[in-house]
UniProtKB/Swiss-Prot annotation:
Protein name: Multidrug resistance protein MdtF
Record function comment: Part of the tripartite efflux system MdtEF-TolC, which confers resistance to compounds such as rhodamine 6G, erythromycin, doxorubicin, ethidium bromide, TPP, SDS, deoxycholate, crystal violet and benzalkonium.
Assembly, per entry: Homotrimer. Part of the tripartite efflux system MdtEF-TolC, which is composed of an inner membrane transporter, MdtF, a membrane fusion protein, MdtE, and an outer membrane component, TolC. The complex forms a large protein conduit and can translocate molecules across both the inner and outer membranes.
Cellular component aspect of the GO annotation: membrane; plasma membrane
């Protein structure tokens, strides 16, 4: 093939230009993302049972739905929560690659089977089935810059005018409002109700009747008389709109003819629909909207669309209302991608300088340099064809590919230059001869490297998706690189290179010194190799010791899934003791805000707090803070990284009295959890009950706290059992007094919970009407005795006459995992430990708990456990495939052994570099290790290929052939290896956005390549001679 293009250079250029054009078009159309769809798709089923406690919700709603979720294609695991607000949420997580649309349809079909078994009140409320991500993409906060709007004014405007347009924006899966729109609040007074012989149900029924939209029909409607001349709509009654109108609702007419109006027994006002959350931005009243991605949506496109929509809506905002973004994960995505692009450019420049140093000829250097954009753009075209995105993983693949793809072109150019100099041939003839010598080596390298990366494409789960991104990117680059090296590169060599002048090229002083030093080094290397081959047994023992060291390093290197990143934002949770009020929670959140805005003012840009809300559940004792940091360029230095800020905050905020305040970083992949570290589900496999499971959980937390050198921040991601005030109704006594149980339940539910009645109109928007006891009549236990229920004879009977009360404990939030009662445990690895170490330690602690208590990993930890199980198989398959590819290529079983024996030399270097830098054996390291395996084999192939050719064509002995081959290939091996090492150097020294991943990829590859080069050039001749002698003896035998 090469000879064809040497004679047709224009054709080679045409193909290269077509590849670049295709790549250019692909880049303009490829979407940009931090990661591909790594996270498995999730479907969430949400239901509400008004007035029910957590246990009732679990028994009558959650379990009923769970038990029908069988036979779903690709379901991995299922988690659910039931809380004291009557909410049930079941999240079903499916295998990566499952269509969210199909999964949603299947879940909806299964839900229909459960519907008849659900309480009627639940069915009336409706059940939603959503396919949005469970994690927050961004938070938009709204503030009044001059204080003219209070938090309820702001929240009502946001709910009425902003929430719905945002929820319809492309890419938005769901929105969560931190605040509430206005509602008509009817605050009942039990004493006045009793005075007029009324109960809450009387109020509710009259509101329903008198606040109603009646369809009155028409005058002159069809069919009509032949001479009908009039047609008009009849308006009978419309919905009420103001507190004054509601206050005039007639409840009853007394015997003396006087009227009892709603305002006589209740206070009527325009209040919030929901008082459960309090939002603040830098301590000022605010409202906020959390945006969650739709399944499969692009984060950058969605964020851009949301901001454009808010910018459009801002033209209609009240004068003082402003939008701020206290939490946004997309700047990190944009900047990290930009950093990798920058790394790509730096790598190309460094590779060019290395090539120029070795080739010392601008014409020769420009040839492999031209190959870089051709192959990279061609790779983008392939990525577009297979449906990939421009993301961190594909860009890392490109950076790794630069060092690999120039290798082929360097091998071609260097050998053509050597033939021109040694054989005194003109460039075209020299190129023909050179390609005949190295064509098989090029094919061999391509086959080996492709064989290394091919098994990665068939791994499963989130890890498999990461591997696939690297695999397709690198294999595409390799194949295109070989194609360019056998088409464009020889064509360029034949047309650009010049014949060697008489006496050879005269290098400048710098190159002359370099050449002198290199020639001495080459001679020393040749002499050393000859010495090594006299005592191969001794060096095979050294090799075995190196392999043993590799095994030790493998065992001691900590494991993890993905490295943590400084994403420019993080969160802080606050949990107060059970029973704490919103007032106390708000004070704690203000202390958190003050700390970040004063003590960390050089690093923190804003703090947005939400009282009453947290990932562990909703409650007055829960709070969450979103902290936005200043740009990375303003936070230079490790002491200003998110990790350092969190460590300082953890110490400082631990001093807050009567609250557990915990700052935490975001996970590497947002959809795989809410916090970094590990995520464990403690399971009640033995059906021990909630109390025993709580005891086991507390024992586990106590054991973990005793080992701060292993794990830290181990905490339950749930709500503690809280005091509950139980009302025991004596049904027999109530029946004897003529009081219906339904009336008792209605009165208690309305007074101490609330009752949604119907809707009213406010500023052209339909809003809700709620009836509830006034604040003074539902604050204390004794308030229960102030309420009366009318009996069958029409007299008022106090609740205290047929009920008793007591204090008890119960959970405000119950959890289940795969249909088993569970409790979620979150935590972090201690300093110097990896998440893999922490997970193993926690598993050992669970083994010490009572029988019947088990565990399972979920979220990011589930994927980490899956990836650690797949890694050994991945390495083994890759090595086997490489061996078979080499055997097929050389039609020999012995030569592949000579090549494969070099692999541990590169692996030990990768492990040593990773260990010395304190990094872990994560997915990026595993990809780097496979790259190292391929590159180690490549260097061996370059030497072995020439040695085999000399043995076959020139009849040399194995020792003579390998010494000469090693001498001839030393320069291209060192050149290509140094080019690769410097190509990944920008990854190794990277800092700022995305540096965690870059360091993880670059460190192992750089260490591995360095070791593979330094050790392999000495050990490959040893391996070749030993294997040849062993196989020669085997044949004789």
């Amino acid at each position: 093939m090469a000879n064809y293009f040497i004679d047709r250079p224009v054709f080679a250029w045409v193909l290269a230009i077509i590849m670049m054009l295709a790549g250019g078009l692909a880049i303009m159309n490829l979407p940009v993302a931090q990661y591909p769809q790594i996270a498995p798709p999730t479907i969430t089923v949400s239901a509400t049972y008004p007035g029910a406690d957590a246990q009732t919700v679990e028994d009558s709603v959650t379990q009923v739905i769970e038990q029908n979720m069988n036979g779903l294609d690709g379901l991995m695991y299922m988690s659910s929560t039931s809380d004291a607000a009557g909410n049930a949420s079941i999240t079903l997580t499916f295998e990566t690659g499952t269509s969210p649309d199909i999964a949603q349809v299947q879940v909806q079909n299964k839900l229909q089977l459960a519907m008849p078994s659900l309480p009627e009140a639940v069915q009336q409320q409706g059940i939603s089935v959503d396919k949005s991500s469970s994690n927050i993409l961004m938070v938009a906060a709204f503030i009044s810059d001059n204080g003219s709007l209070n938090q309820y004014d702001i929240a009502d405007y946001v709910a009425s005018n902003i929430k719905d347009p945002l929820s319809r924006t492309a890419g938005v899966g769901s929105v969560q409002l931190f605040g509430s729109e206005y509602a008509m609040r009817i605050w009942l007074d039990p004493q006045k109700l009793n005075k007029y012989n009324l109960v809450p149900s009387d109020v509710i029924s009259q509101i329903k009747v008198q606040n109603n939209q009646i369809s009155g029909g028409q005058l002159g409607g069809m069919p009509q008389a032949a001479d009908q001349q009039l047609n008009a709509s009849i308006i009978v009654q419309t919905r009420l709109q103001t507190p004054e109108e509601f206050g005039k609702i007639l409840l009853k007419v007394q015997q003396d003819g006087s009227q009892v109006l709603l305002r006589d027994v209740a206070r009527v006002e325009l209040g919030a629909e929901d008082y459960s959350t309090v939002a603040r931005y830098n301590g000022k009243p605010a409202a906020g909207i959390a945006i969650k991605l739709a399944a499969g949506a692009n984060a950058l496109d969605t964020s851009r669309a949301v901001k454009e929509e808010l910018n459009r809506l801002s033209a209609y905002f009240p004068a003082s209302l402003k939008t701020v973004y206290p939490y946004d994960t997309t700047p990190f995505i944009e900047i990290s991608i930009q950093e990798v692009f920058k790394t790509l450019v730096e790598a190309i420049i460094l590779v060019f300088l290395v090539m120029y140093l070795f080739l010392q000829n601008f014409r020769a250097t420009i040839i492999p340099t031209i190959a870089v954009p051709v192959v990279i753009l061609g790779t983008f075209a392939i990525l577009s064809a297979v449906g990939f995105t421009i993301n961190t993983l594909t860009m890392f693949g490109m950076v790794l590919a630069i060092g690999l793809l120039v290798d082929d072109a360097i091998v071609v150019v260097e050998n053509v230059e050597r033939v021109i100099a040694e054989d005194k041939l003109p460039p075209k003839e020299a190129t023909h001869k050179s390609m005949g010598q190295i064509q098989r080596a090029l094919v061999g390298i391509a086959v080996v490297l492709s064989a290394v990366f091919m098994p990665m494409a068939f791994m499963s789960g989130a890890t498999g998706e990461i591997y696939r991104q690297f695999s397709i990117t690198l294999i595409s680059s390799m194949l295109l690189s070989v194609f360019v090296a056998m088409s464009l590169t020889p064509a360029l060599c034949a047309t650009i290179l010049k014949a060697a002048p008489e006496g050879g090229h005269k290098p400048n002083a710098l190159f002359a010194r370099f050449n002198t030093l290199f020639e001495k080094s080459t001679q020393h290397y040749t002499d050393s190799t000859r010495s090594l081959l006299r005592c191969t047994g001794r060096y095979m023992v050294v090799y075995l010791l190196i392999c043993a060291g590799m095994a030790v390093l493998f065992l001691r290197t900590p494991t993890s899934f993905l490295p943590e990143e400084d994403q420019g934002v993080f969160m802080t949770t606050a949990q107060l003791p059970s029973g704490a009020t919103m007032v106390n929670t708000t004070k704690v959140l203000q202390q958190v805000t003050d700390y970040y805005l004063t003590k960390e003012k050089d690093n923190v840009q804003s703090v947005f707090t939400v009282g009453g809300f947290g990932f562990s559940g909703q409650g007055q004792n829960n709070g969450l803070a979103f902290i936005s940091l200043k740009p990375w360029s303003e936070r230079v230095g490790e002491e200003n990284s998110v990790t350092a800020i969190i460590q300082r905050a953890m110490i400082a905020l631990s001093s807050i009295n009567k609250a557990v305040v915990f700052p935490f970083n975001l996970p590497a992949v947002a959809e795989l959890g809410t916090a970094s570290g590990f995520d464990m589900e403690l399971l009640d496999n033995g059906n021990l009950g909630h109390e025993k499971l709580t005891q086991a959980r507390n024992e586990l937390l106590s054991l973990a706290a005793q080992s701060p050198n292993q794990v830290t921040g181990v905490r339950p991601n749930g709500l503690e059992d809280t005091p509950m005030f139980k009302v025991n109704v004596n049904a027999a006594k109530a029946e004897a007094m003529g009081v219906a149980l339904s009336d008792i339940n209605q009165t208690i539910s309305t007074a101490f919970g609330s009752s949604y009645v119907n809707d009213f109109l406010n500023q052209g928007r339909v809003k809700k009407v709620y009836v509830q006891a006034g604040t003074p009549f539902r604050m204390l236990p004794d308030n229960i005795n102030q309420w009366y229920v009318r009996n069958a004879s029409g007299t008022m009977a106090p609740l205290s006459a047929y009920s008793s009360t007591e204090w008890t404990y119960g959970s405000p939030r119950l959890e289940r995992y795969n249909g088993i009662p569970s409790m979620e445990i979150l935590g972090e690895a201690a300093a110097g430990k990896s998440t893999g170490d922490a997970m193993k330690f926690m598993a050992d602690l669970v083994a010490k708990l009572p029988a019947g208590v088990g565990y399972s990993w979920t979220g990011l930890s589930y994927q980490e456990a899956l990836s650690s199980n797949q890694a050994p198989a991945l390495y083994a398959i890759s090595l086997v495939v490489v061996f078979l590819a080499l055997a097929a290529l050389y039609e020999s079983w012995s030569i592949p052994f000579s090549v494969m024996l070099v692999v541990p030399l590169g692996v030990v270097g990768a492990l040593l570099a990773t260990d010395l830098r304190g990094l872990s054996n994560d997915v990026y390291f595993q990809v780097g290790l496979l790259t190292t395996i391929g590159l180690s084999a490549k260097n061996a192939i370059l030497i072995v290929e020439f040695a085999v050719e000399m043995m076959q064509k020139e009849g040399k002995t194995p020792i003579e052939a390998i010494i000469e081959a090693a001498r001839m290939r030393l320069r291209p091996i060192l050149m290509t290896s140094l080019a690769f090492i410097l190509g990944v150097l920008p990854l190794v020294i990277s800092h700022g956005a995305g540096s965690g991943a870059q360091n993880a990829v670059g460190t192992g590859v750089m260490g591995g390549m360095f070791a593979a080069t330094v050790l392999a050039i000495y050990f490959v001749p040893v391996f070749f001679v030993v294997v040849e002698h062993l196989f020669a003896r085997f044949k004789k035998a």
